[in-house]
């Protein structure tokens, strides 16, 4: 899950922006 937070594309989904 750490990689998802680092990726700008998946960061939005992971952070639920």
UniProtKB/Swiss-Prot annotation:
Residue spans crossing the bilayer: none
Q: What is its main location?
A: secreted
Q: What does UniProt give as GO cellular component?
A: extracellular region
> Is Zinc-finger given among the entry's keywords?
no
Q: List the disulfide bonds.
A: 12-17
Sorted alphabetically, the Gene Ontology BP terms of this entry are: defense response to bacterium
Q: Where found, per UniProt?
A: Secreted
Q: In which tissues is it expressed?
A: Expressed by the skin glands.
Alphabetically ordered keywords of this record: Amphibian defense peptide, Antibiotic, Antimicrobial, Disulfide bond, Secreted
Known role: Antimicrobial peptide.
What family is reported? Belongs to the frog skin active peptide (FSAP) family. Ranatuerin subfamily.
Protein name, as recorded: Ranatuerin-2Ra
Q: Which organism is it from?
A: Pelophylax ridibundus (Marsh frog)
Taxonomic lineage: Eukaryota, Metazoa, Chordata, Craniata, Vertebrata
